[in-house]
Amino acid sequence: MSRKILSVALLISLLMGTLWQTMTPTLQAAKTTAKWKTQKTGSAGVLIGKSVLVSIFVEDADSKWNEKQKKDVNRKLKVAAAFIQRQGKRYKKNVTLVADSYANPDLQYEVKTKIKLDDSEKRLNRFSDQMQTRIEQSVNVDEIREKYGTDSIGFVLFINKSGVSSTSVHYMEDGKKNFYEMSALFSKYENAAEGAATYAHEILHLFGARDLYMTSITDGISSALVRHVGKKYPNDIMFSTFTKNGKTLKYKIVNQVDRVTAFYLGWKNTIPEKKKFALGGRNPKGCFSDGTAW
């Protein structure tokens, strides 16, 4: 997960390629969008109530998608969405995550580019600003918000290559910048098929979840907290996306959302770890902050 970094696939694609969709919806008034873009949580908002995921399939000079592969990706996405909804119920939260872009074709887009894509951080930084502009111009967010009745929209970018998946999130301190929050999901990791648990892990970042397997000064994740989670919550999906035997499952998730992740998502108002590990307050829920806005 990264503050201002998204997978190079979309960033380059949006800059150099063409974004299209079979449908041509009508936009709402720009004033509505302007008001929506003042929310401190970024485009994905809070994972309570209804949220929508927009699927964007990326093709470059040496990779493309066929229909069978796209449906396979959509299957994993549906597994991830169902998992997240079940986890919400564990914390008595009503979570509806609309993610099936075949049942909802207005949520499926494609990107083409002649540039060869990879997951390098350097390119992600270079093209992130271009991505924000291009998505705003090409994706009908107003129509999506009106049709699905939500101000919670995340973007999932699918790249048919091996790479490290990542997510670009909005911080309170960003103001109007980096508003559109996106997860870039590679079809493979170390040349093995990626699993649904990684999809869920990256998607949860969109709504405020932190990586719990590594320290982060910006996000207030200390080495002591990482050790604590590893000992007490080793199956938390933000700590590990593997099974207890270290395996990756394509269409099944055996991990769960434990209380530290639930706190960051806004599903729990407080937890013992908040005081013990000096976790920052979350206001509003599900929001990222580097602490300078408090």
Where in this protein do the model-derived segments appear?
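Bacterial N-terminal signal peptides
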Residues: 9-20
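Sec-dependent signal peptide cleavage junction
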Residues: 18-31
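Active-site recognition of the HExxH zinc-binding catalytic motif
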Residues: 197-212
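Propeptide-to-catalytic entry region of secreted or membrane-anchored zinc metalloproteases
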Residues: 30-149
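Auxiliary, metal-adjacent structural segments of Zn-dependent hydrolase domains
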Residues: 132-176
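Short pre-active-site segment immediately N-terminal to the catalytic Zn-binding motif
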Residues: 181-199
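Positively charged n-region of N-terminal signal peptides that target proteins for export
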Residues: 1-8
